Amino acid sequence: MNAGFSRRDFLKGAALLPIASALPASSALAAAEPVRRVGGPQLKVSCNAYSFAKQLGTGGKGPLSLVAFAEFCAKANFDAIDPTGYYFPGYEKNGLGVPTDKLIFELKRRCFDLGLGISGTGIGNNFTTADQAARANDVQRIKKWIEVAAKLGAPVIRVFADTQMRAETWQSVSKGAKRDDVEKWIADDIRECADYGAKFGVTVGVQNHGDFIRTADDQIALIRRIDSPWCGAIVDTGYYRATDNYGEMAKAAPYAVNWQVKQGTEGVENEASAPTDLIRLLKIVRASGYRGYLPIEILSSRGGTAPKDPVKVVPEFLAEVRQAIAATA
């Protein structure tokens, strides 16, 4: 038996099983606390489909299909894919459209054939808006995509607490509402989604995106207010807005149910001046005891610069991440 886990440890754990199983769900699964993990860090690498945003196209209207994306990732030696909802045929930015079961299951079967996991999925939403009807619509959209995630076998769905309206902020779209009031809107909506996710075995991950959630404290406060064992943090390494973004990652890491690993820590515009120190990042991940997928995502600047070629850049970044994983093992 593994030297780090003795027979005595096993028997102690087994003795507690009847007690744990008899507890109410709220006691057995502590809400709003750091994720309880056992064993050492176990890390696998996934590819977020957003890396191929232009090629996939919103609603799957680009020249690259999700199946072809999965095949590329298998050839590149990823462990999994993270097929963002935007790129499925049937996706609607503000509507309730979802892909057909036939399409979902074809992608799932192909990933199985390729030995790829499906590490998660995600959609866009705006819970900071003062428009209550729009927020309610987004709750229903997330519920629809929770069902999609369950059919895919994706354990996590990413949602946002930040506004996704370009050139806007949470202050502007909330019409000047107080932060505590906006946090309550967000928490109530995500809690409803998490309760729905519990019925399908899908965890809701709240991703920091540099607006309402600028720091780990912002993220943790919201997760605690949501207070659900079916909700945790998606730690986006490129979207904290603080003086020490690595410190923010370290603080949020114990709450992580998934990650988004970017090439820079201060946004795509500052990648050259603030590239991600992958060794430092992996030490943070390992120190937290995280076990699971590290989805990577490459971004191209909007505007004048030439877009990155994901066919070239994604495998290069994957190799760098794998080297950092090996170097910190």
What is the role of each PLM region?
Residues N2-S46, S51-D79, I213-A329:
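Histidine-acidic metal/acid-base catalytic patches
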Residues A14-P24, A31-R37, E71, I104-G120, ...:
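Active-site acidic/histidine proton-transfer and metal-coordination neighborhood
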Residues P63-S65, G97-I104, V139-I142, A187, ...:
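Charged helix-capping and loop-helix junction motifs
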Residues D79-A80, G117, P155, T203, ...:
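Residue-level detector of anion-binding/catalytic polar loops
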Residues D82, G120-G122, R158, Q260, ...:
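Conserved beta-strand positions in the central sheet of alpha/beta enzyme cores
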Residues D82-E106, Q164-A167:
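Glycine-rich, proline-tolerant flexible connector loops at the mouths of alpha/beta enzymes
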Residues G85, N125, A161, Q263, ...:
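Residues that line or immediately flank small-molecule/substrate-binding pockets and catalytic motifs
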Residues N94-G97, N126-R135, T265-G267:
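The substrate-binding groove and active-site-proximal loops of carbohydrate-active enzymes
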